[in-house]
Amino acid sequence: SDVYKRQNQEFVPPYGTGATLYLRPLLIGVGENIGVAPAPEYLFIIFCMPVGSYFKGELAPTNFIVSDYDRAAPNGTGAAKVGGNYAASLLPGYEAHERNFSDCIYLDPETHTKIEEVGSANFFGITAENEFVTPKSPSILPSITKYSLLYLADHALGLTPVEGDVYVDQLDRFVEAGACGTAAVISPIGGIQNGESFHVFYSETEVGPKTRALYDELTGIQFGERKAPAGWIFDVPLD
């Protein structure tokens, strides 16, 4: 990947713009078969694109809605980054946007009582007892952003990192909440619509202090403004 970055160095955004060079590996079946079967041949691509800051203005909370749809099936492909998982979220996401919500909150497909993921990102909540809580499920896509935040919550903010069940009827245990992923790093959640009820966390207009601190810490590391834990940063010579 270092060679690839050097070959595309002209697309690296200038420091200070908040923009980044986004790299996405893709594996596509291209073999000559039309049946439902693994492809006999694959094409590996690294998609490279400069992207601007996810937020057009300041970091700000938005509202989400609990979906009646299932994102992934039990014992299915929920933990893999495959196109089918995203296809299942297109209609629910469209309907959420039509109702002026940023995205959907998906529950576990077996009991529909536990939060699993937020659209294309992971969910987290922060309790009044200073716990940083994320759902734990075999249907959740592993996220380097989530694991980075779990580490920083502990080592930088002194929060207690917890991976476990997050019941949708117990949202009042959280004083702050958000979604986390590669693109936005953190998307603060102002409130969640669940059926007829609407739960507000810290605020619908202001970012919670611990969410802000986590965002500043991780983005500061990414842009070389704060000290990174050992092994997190790799220098890529561009000359």
Describe these PLM feature segments.
Residues 2-4:
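Short, small-residue-biased leader/transition segments that mark boundaries at the very start
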Residues 8-9, 153:
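Active-site helix/loop of acyl-thioester processing domains in fatty-acid/polyketide metabolism
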Residues 9-13, 37:
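Active-site loop segments of alpha/beta catalytic cores
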Residues 13-28:
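Extended, Lys/Arg-enriched charged tracts that mediate electrostatic binding to polyanionic substrates
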Residues 26, 33-239:
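Helix-start/capping segments and mature chain N-termini
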